[in-house]
Amino acid sequence: MPGIKVHPNESFDEAYRKFKKQVDRNLIVTEVRARRFFEPMTEIRKKQKISARKKMLKRLYMLRRYESRL
């Protein structure tokens, strides 16, 4: 869990901004949203398969685009 040290001369807004930045860096909000509902392993594998396919197609597109310029 992120925590910050608030200095005596620091305003609430600055401390809040620091805290939000740490939360965003640690991906806490996205993880909580992902874990909000139970997801069976079959669904997780399905999503991983889809994302792997998207990544592969993107790389293939970039490779073909690069080769066409040569």
Swiss-Prot record:
GO BP annotations, alphabetical order: translation
Q: Mind listing the GO molecular function terms for this protein? A: structural constituent of ribosome
InterPro entries linked? Ribosomal_bS21 (IPR001911), Ribosomal_bS21_sf (IPR038380)
Q: Print the keywords alphabetically.
A: Ribonucleoprotein, Ribosomal protein
TM ranges are none
The entry's cellular-component GO terms read: ribonucleoprotein complex; ribosome
- Signal sequence: where? none
| Xref: Pfam families | Ribosomal_S21
Family the UniProt entry places it in: Belongs to the bacterial ribosomal protein bS21 family.
Q: What is this protein called?
A: Small ribosomal subunit protein bS21
Per the UniProt record, the lineage of the source organism begins with: Bacteria, Pseudomonadati, Campylobacterota, Epsilonproteobacteria, Campylobacterales
Q: Gene of origin? A: rpsU
